[in-house]
């Protein structure tokens, strides 16, 4: 995440980046499944389940920034950075879960299983 921007900006961006990665990736993947002759709604649901972790990684800006923040918080005693990073991860998890829920509502795939 951008260190120059304020924390709330990064917090909101983290949520919506994860949401966009999950919804966009699943819908574009569903289009690819349709073009390949596979059932698109099933493919969208499967992709949404698989993309959750990647939406989280994309939203927090890669794993090295998070690891560096944790390292700085632990080794330098800067617990504020650890708390901020945890909040950013929770925000990204919320965005990914919201995206998965929207996909679940749109496809209604859980009703046919």
UniProtKB/Swiss-Prot annotation:
Changes seen on gene knockout: Impaired ability to form spores when associated with a ytrI deletion. In combination with a ybaN deletion, cells show a severe sporulation defect.
Membrane-protein topology: Multi-pass membrane protein
Gene induction: Transcriptionally regulated by sigma-E.
InterPro entries: Spore_YtrH
Alphabetical UniProt keywords: Membrane, Sporulation, Transmembrane, Transmembrane helix
GO BP annotation list: sporulation resulting in formation of a cellular spore
Cited Pfam families: Spore_YtrH (PF14034)
One Gene Ontology term, aspect cellular component: membrane
Chain ranges passing through the membrane: 16-36, 51-71, 86-106
Subcellular location: Forespore outer membrane
Reported function: Involved in sporulation. May contribute to cortex formation or stability.
Protein name: Sporulation membrane protein YtrH
Source organism of the structure: Bacillus subtilis (strain 168)
Gene transcribed to yield this protein: ytrH
